[in-house]
Amino acid sequence: MIHLTGENLKFKEIEKVINHGEQVELSTQAKENIIASRRLIDDLTEKESIVYGVTTGFGKFSDTFISSENLQQLQENLILSHSAGVGEPFSEQVVRGMMLFRANSLAKGHSGIRLETVQLLIDMLNKGVHPIIPSKGSLGASGDLAPLAHMVLVMIGKGEAYYHGDRMAGDKALSEAGLSPVKLGAKEGLALINGTQAIVSVGTLTWLRMKNLLKTADICAAMTIDSLEGILDAFQDKIFRLRPHPGHGKTAENIRRLLQDSEIIENREHKRVQDAYTLRCIPQIHGASKDAHEHIGGILNREINSTTDNPLIFPQENEVISGGNFHGQPLALPMDYMSMAIAELANVAERRIERLVNPNLNFGLPPFLIKDGGVSSGFMIAQYTAASLVSENKSLAHPASVDSIPSSANQEDHVSMGTIGARKALSILENTEKVLAIELLCASQALDYRQPRQSGSGTRKAYELVREQVPHLAEDRELASDIETVEQLIVEGRLVSELEKTIGELK
């Protein structure tokens, strides 16, 4: 059971909730905080005080006073009107992340929402009622309005949801889960949708998968170094003590461990003084992406445990203050940074693939890694596929955050586009997983030709894992299924987890 406080939700806990259905509950202190902030909202509505989003309209309508008899309708209309998203629905994991992160933010007690409303959101999460949320339509300020509105639709008995794998009307999903829709009170609709939880959810899921991707990239690179009889001098620890970026040293250590006891490298047949950059500079290239990953993780963790509402409720001071915590810019820039950091892993991997298949660069391996070249084309078109994915990544890596379009009659005249950036980062990651799968296939094929010399202790294990799934390519066959099989080995984390059982945890 994960206890939500709004202060210290951690990535390991997030993984358990999003991927494994771990149950969630509010801490005692969180409940007290929520009740205290709601008490102030109730006092203000009784006095008919003018407070943005409580007794006024929204956006450009903020100067329109709403009488007490219309406050409930105001909040329901907010959800209905803001449910304007389009496109394919977010995945179940993204939706669960949005629900979890919104509940955690509300747990801090600065949003003025009722305890029973937050509890319904948590009950939906725990029971597996997953609102259908279109993935497009957010500007990333004022928060992720459209995506979160679709989440709240189900809470009020509207919209659609998945329950036990079946798509159904929102009210039916609640009923089958033993839950009842809520009637939103003053400010509650605004409290539920004024946040950055779509950006955070997509970004966090991408970040979590990137951790596995970074280790996978090191494994693939080590296999390519092994199969190309690479020079290990460039990975000596003393080099990285002189330029101590953390990711550089971690990558170099991984490469050394993966290639330990490689007979191919110890008995090199093709002598040279130094390798090309795509081999020699792997610590600097991969390491920079690792440092980016570390930096972005800190930002995501801060945001997950923040209040991103407006206005903010300060019950101790008896204050309600309008601010800009909903603005997604603190996330939009890191999402673009993550896109570039992941794209670079694909860029360098594709160049390593080229070195493996190109007879002018691969030190005695068959052209396109096939013995009967000419009759068979081998991995020629697999490299094309990698090049296509890398080129697509370059387009996707163009920063979303440099764009802004004014909205709400120019009241909201700068927006972050952070949700677009997060979605692009996820697409780049998925493309990069495919590129690494192709490198893994090519490197395994290359290692076949280096036998009987044995590869390194780590690369040998990775090779064995691939060969358990995909046989040597002796003659042309459909490669799409091979790529997909190895991609799943990567995506499911089996490549990394099984290899770490052999050589210990990679950094």
Curated annotation (Swiss-Prot):
Q: Where in the cell is it found?
A: Cytoplasm
Q: What is its main location?
A: cytoplasm
PTM note:
Contains an active site 4-methylidene-imidazol-5-one (MIO), which is formed autocatalytically by cyclization and dehydration of residues Ala-Ser-Gly.
Q: Which SUPFAM superfamilies does this UniProt record tie to the protein?
A: L-aspartase-like
- CDD domains, per database record: PAL-HAL
The reaction(s) this protein catalyses: L-histidine = trans-urocanate + NH4(+)
Does the record bear Protease in its keywords? no
- From its record, what is one biological process in GO terms? L-histidine catabolic process to glutamate and formamide
- GO MF annotation: an example: histidine ammonia-lyase activity
Identify the keywords attached in UniProt to this record, alphabetized. Cytoplasm, Histidine metabolism, Lyase
Return the broad EC class.
lyase
Metabolic or biological pathway: Amino-acid degradation; L-histidine degradation into L-glutamate; N-formimidoyl-L-glutamate from L-histidine: step 1/3
Pfam families assigned: Lyase_aromatic (PF00221)
The UniProt feature for the cross-link 5-imidazolinone (Ala-Gly) gives its location as A141-G143
Q: Name one GO cellular component term.
A: cytoplasm
Locate the 2,3-didehydroalanine (Ser) modifications and list their residues: S142
PANTHER family from the UniProt entry: HISTIDINE AMMONIA-LYASE (PTHR10362)
- Cited NCBIfam families: hutH, PRK09367.1
What's the protein name? Histidine ammonia-lyase
Q: Which gene encodes it?
A: hutH
